[in-house]
Structures are given as C-alpha cells and as structure tokens.
From Swiss-Prot:
Homology family: Belongs to the conotoxin C superfamily. Consomatin family.
Misc: This peptide is an evolutionarily optimized stable analog of somatostatin. In addition, it adopts nearly identical conformations as in the somatostatin drug analog Octreotide. As this drug, it contains a D-Trp at the same position, whose synthesis is a common strategy used for enhancing the metabolic stability of compounds in drug design.
Keyword Signal among UniProt keywords: yes
GO cellular component terms, A-Z: extracellular region
Protein known as: Consomatin Ro2
Length: 82
C-alpha cells in the first residue's frame, strides 16, 4: 500500500515539475502525449480495427439472449480429460 502511495506521489511530482519551471499546464499535458497522436490517427486506428460485415459469419450470430451457437475455439472432445 505504501509503495502505491509513493508511486502516485512521484507521478504527481513528475507531471507538475515543469509548472514550477515556468511552464503552462497545457505544455505539461502536451509533453505527456506523443506528437503523432492526432484525432485523425485515432479515428483511422478505430476504423481499421472494426470488423467489416463480410467478416461476421452466420454461425457467430446470437439471437437476442435466447440462443447462441457454441464458440469455435471450444474443444468439446476434451470433456473429463483434465
């Protein structure tokens, strides 16, 4: 518990240290964010991770909490072998 407390204190000191050197809060926040992280980059990465409709197979669809087919990664032939 003490380690977590001191880690939190040190992180706060590390983040706020530039303020004592005459920096503005905005500069401190900009210093924590990578330069290539822009809204366009975030949007592009979210779109590229989204599965397209053609990737969704019919056997993976669930009928509203009434029936879902078994997942393909489950191995039913291993029952009782553990």
């Amino acid at each position: 518990m003490q380690t977590a407390y001191w880690l939190m204190v040190m992180m706060m000191v590390w983040i706020t240290a530039p303020l004592y050197e005459g920096g503005k809060p905005n500069d401190v926040i900009r210093g924590l964010v990578p330069d290539d992280l822009t809204p366009q980059f975030i949007l592009r990465s979210l779109i590229s991770r989204r599965r397209s409709d053609k990737d969704v197979r019919a056997d993976q669809t669930c009928i509203w909490k009434t029936w879902c087919p078994p997942s393909l990664w489950r191995r039913h032939d291993r029952k009782g072998k553990d």
